């Protein structure tokens, strides 16, 4: 039964043709260099998320899958928790409350409305609650509302308060029994220990010490002889001798044990666990039972019970029922430990099963499992329900039995709060990475060892971060972050799936008597260790026999060797089986160093969507599937004919007579400020099939992932301007918007009720000219289409200001003219520093329109500003091989090097970036890019027939027109000799010239002089990505701005509109040059001399000389700190007189500030803010 859960077998017919883009109707024809046939299509890339959530809510689709797998009575996650909880009994046992049948109503609002109105995409959860009065037998049943339950969208995400979030799967150590060995430093003896780790409850640890006695630790308390525990469980000395008589160390432990009988042993354990409490036999017996043998306190979980049974060879043929420890488990664990210490290879357990005796590797994927989204939410609900259980028990005792109904007992607040807390604040519920479709897809397939119950990055060692042989086909060895999280966060491999126990499985083709079949078995890492596995590219004949006598295989632990074909059990299904989706999109990955491939996989996720997407000339065949499963393209649900197409929607009349309308997302803002826009790629009257892509999204072209642009690249130095990874670009890319992207920023402001009155959104703003208000409508909100720059008003808002004390002059003026100035201040929403763009959208939410707003908020306005960013110096570009760089110079087209036919190159990369980084894949991509762009024709009609280098190529690769798109799958792509042959077979241009030689180099001419460069240069097409590290977001300048309240020094950082810190080392430089006055200015009037700052400004305005600096505020802070340490510090002048330190209430300062119109009020965010 258990083996059945772990092994899922599916078959495919042997005649299945190679999976290419053609398996998706209407897909572009990408010519593949793959030599191997894949017998299995890539599974749904979001299944790890969607199937787990389906299990949680008990969806019909999940039940059908579970039944097909052989589960007789599948139980959903919510149902499981409610069954665990039920019944809740009161303290006397006279009444009980049980829950069953969780079900959902319709979701409250569609996904788009939830995003728009900051709502949570959720459905109301109802359960049937049954109250039973055990004294009278009376039963009251009610349907109870358990709160709004966040639902998963079709794309595997959650919408929480209007933002899209992803719950990341967590890699944790599986519950079970783990044997370990260590070397004692003093005696150099090999010592063994074992931990029994439950899903929930106390740990039980046994170990053999250097004195050769077997000890036990219960719940991490003091060690005691293991025989004490056996006696406490009711064993006599004779029984212990009978079972463990073979072992000297057990016998010596029994001799040293002073307890005589069960009662004494129980009391001994009680004293260790509860020191200071008076021990009694009953309390000791209850304590031991509660610790390990009661389901309320101890839970091995199904997976823990399965692992214990498997390791110790217990009840392997029976279904899993108990989730607590049993006496048999404890005894078998002790025997296994003893036999391990004595060096025995196997152990025969009662029932005649023989199990191998060996230590465990805790980093092995047989011992690490995934907590997927369903289980993580289930655990949180369990926490909420246990809090609710306490409330129910209290209410049972306080309320009148006759009046009790399930509704009066239940308080759903703890459950709702637990779910909200998880989605809002958990480390595993993350703001979705929406930079581009690939980043979102990868985020949903991420595996994290961090989070509650997991590791912490500070304590994680090298072993747990390292690549392990059991990761093969389960977790990608390439894709992981650089930095402190390296190895702790990974990505699921392409073909991997998660089984019901949470272990990751990978598929293999069954090999029977040396014949490879198309039967697919999914194996866990444990299962795989028992078998001999051949690699996917082992040569086969048409019948599936291995063509070579000796086959390269791997055995347990990743050991590689040659064996005869009859010894092989399984074979990989695909060469890309071991890598993740992002890594599988790197062509020629096999020629890249792993460190650079890691950067390449990570940087594809940082690519920004461009105005015009362009699919790569050189792909891997993964682009189409990744784009469709990412969910940003629109896919036809049914076959039919397109009736109507517009920029906003597509209407399809299906063959069954139903009409389907697909709406496009138009210029929406993603979580990362990039532009998500969909556009149709079908025409009215066109026939579409089910599953066909009908509209492209961001970063897609014709349904394929298109993260960058195919650019003509020359790899050469150029006047030193591309030194150290700098990049030289052609101005054509700027003028023709080749690398232009659109970025959308959201600006929000609300009008609240304040103590002094309500704030108001209005056009009537004090002290603002009509010129500034020109783009505001009558409500005070900027019009759509307005061009705005930093400092421009987007939404006018005024806030009531407290009445100030009037001067006698003002009172006189008011008495004469009877004019009362409006006591409001301008708190309008303005465009932040360094930002500009065009207003493309406005959303107004108001209480009057019955919109849901937070307490105290009357109106909320959102303004969307779009910015078109052309490529510029300082932007970061990258290829797919970790070859990244910053643009150092943009040259006019006429100055760029050009080919013999006059074509200027688009981009110049330095040659030094290749050899030491060992990412040769970029060079091969460049060559194949040129071949694909030019087209080719292999001369097979000549006297020699098919050339040697082309013998392994399929016939469809013998010729191709120009602008073909090709696929070179990872580990199964174009070979070097094929590339050389193809370069020699490229089609000539319109003048009949072939410009690139067989070695991939061309003669280039200097655009400035027209002279040829002395050596041939590698030229071809490389796929270049524009990354999210844009110079516009980083460049920053300040003249005057906000100051820190305490030190009065300028703030730091672009976000605070801060200044550039002139630090300690910079001061040393000034001192070294003797620049005393410059240094004095920097430390005083340019920084935190509050009086001096204003006086200097006054002097500059009036054209006077700069006055002497005063005392910096930070010096006053230093004095205050010393005084707070009870040190009396006085400042003396040169003649010994004490100088009084005043806190900035200088009359000169106030007068000068008033004359200059500067507000020095401490209530303002800055003491000197608007000097204009």
Curated annotation (Swiss-Prot):
EC supergroup of this enzyme: transferase
Reaction(s) the record says it catalyses: RNA(n) + a ribonucleoside 5'-triphosphate = RNA(n+1) + diphosphate
UniProt GO BP: DNA-templated transcription
Any Pfam family hit: RNA_pol_Rpb2_45
A GO MF term: DNA-directed RNA polymerase activity
SUPFAM superfamilies noted in UniProt: beta and beta-prime subunits of DNA dependent RNA-polymerase (SSF64484)
Keywords linked to the UniProt accession: DNA-directed RNA polymerase, Nucleotidyltransferase, Transcription, Transferase
EC number(s) from the headed UniProt entry: 2.7.7.6
Gene Ontology annotations for the cellular component aspect, listed alphabetically: DNA-directed RNA polymerase complex
Superkingdom assignment: Bacteria
PROSITE patterns the record matches: RNA_POL_BETA (PS01166)
Family assignment from sequence similarity: Belongs to the RNA polymerase beta chain family.
Oligomeric and partner information: The RNAP catalytic core consists of 2 alpha, 1 beta, 1 beta' and 1 omega subunit. When a sigma factor is associated with the core the holoenzyme is formed, which can initiate transcription.
Reported function: DNA-dependent RNA polymerase catalyzes the transcription of DNA into RNA using the four ribonucleoside triphosphates as substrates.
Protein name: DNA-directed RNA polymerase subunit beta
Organism field: Mycobacterium sp. (strain JLS)
Gene: rpoB
